[in-house]
Amino acid sequence: MKTYRSESLFAEARSLFPGGVNSPVRAFRAVGGAPRFIARGEGAFLVDVDGNRYIDYVLSWGPLILGHAHPNVVAAIAEQAAHGTSFGAPTELESELARLITQAMPSVEMVRFVSSGTEAAMSALRLARAATRRDKVIKFAGCYHGHFDGFLVQAGSGVATLGLPDSPGVTAATAASTLTAPYNDLDAVESLLKANPGEVAAIAVEPVAGNMGLVLPQPGFLEGLRRLADEHGALLIFDEVMTGFRVGYGGAQGKYGITPDLTCLGKVIGGGLPAAAYGGRRDLMELIAPAGPVYQAGTLSGNPLAMAAGAATLRAIRAPGVFEQLERAAAMLCSGFEHAAAEADIALRTAYAGSMWGFFFTDEPVVDYVSAKKSDTQRYAQFFHAMLERGIYLAPAQFEASFVSLAHSDALIQETIAAAADALRSIQNAARKG
């Protein structure tokens, strides 16, 4: 596989951007080698600048649930671009996308659009603090809520990949207001609430954790968080930036039947363009300026290009049978990977929820960040490169979720499973030879 052009561009990029990239995980630091520079996307495929073609399971880290360059989304963007790209004034498109969201998620009675998941999470926490007149927040080790200081404590995603427990630049005072519990551990949450009586504004959680690899909520965990939040006067924030319109049309809250007070959204709702949102109970959202005193603003919030792309995407995925098809594809991948690993005598655990899926090189159940960290990251790096050579583009880091789209046909899923079987056999044979 030729990679000269990618390697050349990466060498130049290192003189232009920190680490050569504009988001850390793209640098291939966790797996080694030079990242592929992408020329275009086509349905389920990426094509790099050297002409190599890959079946893509990153999908821009989640937004592209329809696949790359879907005709409906491309047409919506082109139509709006011809009329203008941004106005700094209200548009009908904002209301159209907001209606689609509020209809899909009854807990979201009002919504405010922003431009990134980080903005959504930081704004939701500011609102929770104002509404409760409390300062502290409980989050979960390995969960990632963007690079806002208040959440950048024992975070997942690139923070976990780079092995950073916290980020320099986060003040001690800020970190002290962030309390951390193990994912799926209700006893730990209850202990924190009791140790900080009347001080916790919110419990913030990824209802399906996707930033330490994919970790599912254990039965009763989300219900328990709802109960504990109610008992202690805290708000429950679901960070559905990743899971919203990914694990089901109604997000994780619809899939698991839990009603949060506030919800953060992103990724899919922008259709591949920068868009995110936070929303929830009307009485809470009416505290946001200009209706109320809690300030938040953004130059490109609700920009018409992203609104058009997002609305086109949500209209496409609300069709009957869409999420059954997506979950079936994720289930096929997990089953196929498990079978291939067993045949190669390699320990591997998989999980999926809706169109999200993931795997760990471990023989132990993965229920939290501690157990996720037991995965063999060196083997993951070997597998990643073996799959890349076979035309499969996986996340270049163990501690990230993978995704499927409507463009991933059964034939492509089977091709991926066959590649995985061949890659795992190759890895095991090399290990046996020493």
Swiss-Prot record:
Pathway: Porphyrin-containing compound metabolism; protoporphyrin-IX biosynthesis; 5-aminolevulinate from L-glutamyl-tRNA(Glu): step 2/2; Porphyrin-containing compound metabolism; chlorophyll biosynthesis
UniProt subcellular location: Cytoplasm
Cystine bridges: none
CDD domains named in the record: OAT_like
EC number, UniProt record: 5.4.3.8
SUPFAM superfamilies according to UniProt: PLP-dependent transferases
Record bears the keyword Cytoplasm: yes
One GO-annotated biological process of the protein: protoporphyrinogen IX biosynthetic process
Catalytic activity: (S)-4-amino-5-oxopentanoate = 5-aminolevulinate
Residues with N6-(pyridoxal phosphate)lysine modification: 267
HAMAP family: HemL_aminotrans_3 (MF_00375)
PANTHER family named among the record's database cross-references: GLUTAMATE-1-SEMIALDEHYDE 2,1-AMINOMUTASE (PTHR43713), GLUTAMATE-1-SEMIALDEHYDE 2,1-AMINOMUTASE 1, CHLOROPLASTIC-RELATED (PTHR43713:SF3)
Family affiliation: Belongs to the class-III pyridoxal-phosphate-dependent aminotransferase family. HemL subfamily.
Assembly behavior: Homodimer.
Name recorded for this polypeptide: Glutamate-1-semialdehyde 2,1-aminomutase
Native organism taxonomy: Bacteria, Bacillati, Chloroflexota, Chloroflexia, Chloroflexales
Gene (UniProt): hemL
